[in-house]
Amino acid sequence: MASYPCHQHASAFDQAARSRGHSNRRTALRPRRQQEATEVRLEQKMPTLLRVYIDGPHGMGKTTTTQLLVALGSRDDIVYVPEPMTYWQVLGASETIANIYTTQHRLDQGEISAGDAAVVMTSAQITMGMPYAVTDAVLAPHIGGEAGSSHAPPPALTLIFDRHPIAALLCYPAARYLMGSMTPQAVLAFVALIPPTLPGTNIVLGALPEDRHIDRLAKRQRPGERLDLAMLAAIRRVYGLLANTVRYLQGGGSWREDWGQLSGTAVPPQGAEPQSNAGPRPHIGDTLFTLFRAPELLAPNGDLYNVFAWALDVLAKRLRPMHVFILDYDQSPAGCRDALLQLTSGMVQTHVTTPGSIPTICDLARTFAREMGEAN
């Protein structure tokens, strides 16, 4: 092959330029890395925060357990962020919970179509999710890196949340899809809106035998609720799949690589109680991903349309970093409280980002509770 001097000179010039560019970039990166290292050292000197999200199917005893735990601490070191009942019932819309249950009942009785029910359910679920999503966004600037859990000193502040945003933006929409009152497209639209998972996100899911769960749910009184056993079975199934999905992802599972292992479009059978991270990695068929092998989401060649595949990528990205714990609710309220307290010792704290973050977070949590915590 012929060799051309001009090309040789150009090549030599390019090599010199690249070498000089790499050198300049290395020089430029040094101050940046030094600054980042300094910021990390400063952050590590900041107070720590423990955030605990008590989640899972309704009616297990989450709120009672949480309130008993909060009562153990002082007002200054543990703050409870309750369900935003006032927003659901008054501020965001009128009687949202009753509207949801009535709509499902009318669909089950054949009084309205699935399409009509889906319109109402999707709108109502937006109302249910808004307070969680916006609170997460306001809190995010104050959350620094994870401080670890082993041998960590007590946090300066513990925040106990009655549910994480995924309850309203993933789990309940997915359960309504199983109930026939929401489309899979709408569920993935909610998935796309799940906020990025903050460091130190500790989520407590619950385990309770179904018969005991039914008994507890029948005895409680919540505004607008109906005893819907089919919905209870659906939401229990979804939370079981959620726990499996986190284990699957943290165990190295990739939904894109394993998608071909799903066959047909059948909804998975009801599974066992949520399990901790112990044990083998679940099969993709025992995760939330199996719900989305639905005809409405598939292209003619049988693959997911890209827009829906991207939503599943978001789902994987949001769930993978979560720290999931399982609380056994099949015991007395005091026993549940003590078991939850024991779980917190293994949870992951985070540093806050500024010296004023702790009082700011306290004010945020108390404002939320005061404005939205109780229905008027």
Swiss-Prot record:
Effect on the protein of changing C336Y: In strain: Isolate CL24; acyclovir resistant
The record's function comment reads: Catalyzes the transfer of the gamma-phospho group of ATP to thymidine to generate dTMP in the salvage pathway of pyrimidine synthesis. The dTMP serves as a substrate for DNA polymerase during viral DNA replication. Allows the virus to be reactivated and to grow in non-proliferative cells lacking a high concentration of phosphorylated nucleic acid precursors.
**Basic residues: compositionally biased ranges:** 19-32
- Annotated InterPro entries: Herpes_TK, P-loop_NTPase
Q: What is the effect of changing N376H?
A: In strain: Isolate clinical MA/1, Isolate clinical PR/1 and Isolate clinical PR/2
Q: Which residues bind ATP?
A: G56, P57, H58, G59, M60, G61, K62, T63, R216
Q: Share any extra remarks.
A: Phosphorylates and thereby activates certain drugs used to treat herpes simplex infections like acyclovir (ACV), valaciclovir, and famciclovir to a toxic form, that leads to successful suppression of the infection, while the uninfected cell does not have this ability because it lacks TK. Mutations in thymidine kinase may induce HHV resistance to antiviral therapies in immunocompromised patients. The most frequently observed resistant strains are unable to express TK and are avirulent in animal models of disease.
Main EC class of this protein? transferase
- Its gene is TK
Source species taxonomy: Viruses, Duplodnaviria, Heunggongvirae, Peploviricota, Herviviricetes
**What effect on the protein does mutating A192V have, as reported in its record?**
In strain: Isolate clinical LA/1 and Isolate clinical LA/2; acyclovir resistant
Q: Name one GO biological process term.
A: DNA biosynthetic process
Quote the annotated effect of V348I: In strain: Isolate clinical h20
Q: What is the effect of changing S23N?
A: In strain: Isolate clinical h3
Q: Where is this region: Disordered?
A: 1-39, 260-280
Q: What is the effect of changing P173R?
A: In strain: Isolate CL20; acyclovir resistant
Q: What's the protein name? A: Thymidine kinase
Would you indicate the residue range of the signal peptide? none
**Consequence of mutating G251C?**
In strain: Isolate McKnight, Isolate clinical LA/1, Isolate clinical LA/2, Isolate clinical MA/1, Isolate clinical PR/1 and Isolate clinical PR/2
| Result, substituting T158A | In strain: Isolate clinical h20
